[in-house]
Amino acid sequence: MKSMRILPISLTIMAGLLSIEASAVEFHGYARSGIGWTGSGGEQQCFQSTGAQSKYRLGNECETYAELKLGQELWKDGNKSFYFDTNVAYSVAQKNDWESTDPAFREVNVQAKNVIDWLPGSTLWAGKRFYQRHDVHMIDFYYWDISGPGAGLQDIDLGFSKLALAVTRNTESGGSYGWIASQRKEIPTSNDVYDIRLSGLEVNPGGNLELGFDYGRANARDHYKLDRHASKDGFMFTAEHTQSMLGGFNKFVVQYATDSMTSSNSGHSEGASVNNDGYMLRILNHGAINLAEKWDLMYVAMYQDTDRDNNNGNTWYTVGVRPMYKWTSTMSTLLDIGYDNVKSQRTHDTNDQYKITLAQQWQAGDSIWSRPAIRLFATYAKWNEKWGNANKKDGYIDGMAYRDTATHKFSRGDDDEFTFGAQFEAWW
């Protein structure tokens, strides 16, 4: 009984302490979850073309995912300030009530604004951070993302544009070798990415240009070395034009990457790898616009060619649209249509898939970006695949592309499926 009396007192004290700082703490985040079924039976399946780096997400997400961000301005004096930011992410298979998981510590950093007197308007930062990520929302595809532990200085005013400088790190699971007590030992390899960006270059009315250069290199520890065939380093160049139009925007992007920067094709480096020498060329156009009073539209079209020296690259085409009709300010209907085509450099065979989703949605506002949203959806997917990547269990070369044979199928084959369900999505 004594513990029962202490509990309300403790909660009262905690509530009082929290209320003191409640106005200063900022809570942001993202979350989605739901329930779905597959027409042929069982829980909801999700569909992604083999070789494609993403999928059309509406009515095609099978997990519960959340990012919970807490931040606070810790100090402010005039226009100078220090802001502390954190982000913890969770992902589970949404199959049970209790699903234990280890959270991912995605962000913890401090951002100091205007603390360098001779660089007014700039921000100095250090720590783990989502750093100026560029993505296509409708396919959940991050095409420029060097996020990770790092440090940098951004928003340096050059008059004609803003300059940003940063260095971040990502680590490969292996790749560095050494001899310890006469035994060969492999350890993880860190990769450093150095990022330079110019943004806000006004090139036409309502249009601006952002240019970026990323150099990534593997950084092996002392007494360890990389394989002599490792790619070691690489670079990625990005040019992105953003045009304000029709109550929204259009982004046209050209990217070129080499060697270690072609593993993820987004800005992370894998210089210890022995199979990523080559280049990547990406041409991307995407946006979201208002077509009429009751119509909004998202769209994407992309060409991506990853050419490997070991002949294990691929060429990926994708095109999709998501029109939205607004019945009221809080109710809408969405149709999501997407097509993927991926050709193997090694086998010269093609995998293709199209996916169609019809969703009835209730959302907090009349924009295609309005969230939270609750939607009921029905999805149909049809695919025809002729190649896939082997794994160690197959007895073939791990990660290498192979054509389907009469005795072994590497791909998903030729099939279709129907799913339906309900989902919420929120960001704040």
Curated annotation (Swiss-Prot):
Site (Greasy slide, important in sugar transport): Y30, Y65, W98, F249, W369, W427
SUPFAM superfamilies associated with the record: Porins
Database matches in Gene3D superfamilies: Porin, LamB type (2.40.170.10)
Induction and repression of expression: By maltose.
Site (Important in sugar transport): Y142
A Pfam family of this chain: LamB
Subunit structure: Homotrimer formed of three 18-stranded antiparallel beta-barrels, containing three independent channels.
Protein's name according to its UniProt entry: Maltoporin
Organism in which the protein naturally occurs: Photorhabdus laumondii subsp. laumondii (strain DSM 15139 / CIP 105565 / TT01)
Gene: lamB
